[in-house]
Amino acid sequence: RSAESEETYRKEWKEVIDCLYSYPCIGTWVPFNEAWGQFKTQEIAEWTKQYDPSRLVNPASGGNHYTCGDMLDLHHYPGPEMFLYDAQRATVLGEYGGIGLVLKDHLWEPNRNWGYIQFNTSAEATAEYLKYAGILKDMISRGFSAAVYTQTTDVEVEVNGLMTYDRKVIKVDEQKLKKINDSICRSLDK
């Protein structure tokens, strides 16, 4: 990375934080995703934490891992799997899932659609989600802290959303997902 590129990144990263600082829904700053342009990770994570100590810092979601920031974040597709743990930080699965289901007439690009794993019916896609959720629930006792499903909606040529690109059709059984997600959230209740 050139000095000019680094300076631009730092300037723009500060602008992002300044612009979004007052949004209480933001709980974590994530300066890098999947090692795309990742550089001086420890320095950037430390600066971010000093600049806004009120929020968690995820130094690199699914990227090259360093022992800095508040969490260790892995990506694994399609099913959830954790192959690293950190006893000093939250261990999270920043991306998993990608359950593809093509619904004609609700596609951004009808001739190009992709998912990590493809199914033909809502029932099949729901069953796969429930299977993954069961795996997540079992991982909690091993120190697993959080997960982010890819993804809420279809986007452009990716058909792995829980709802279609146009937001008109929910592609899975909402009640079954709510039930399993609630059970995961309550799994640590005594």
Model-identified regions with their sequence ranges:
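Substrate-binding/catalytic cleft of secreted carbohydrate-active enzymes
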Residues: R1-K176, I180
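Surface beta-strand/loop "capping" patches
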Residues: S183-K190
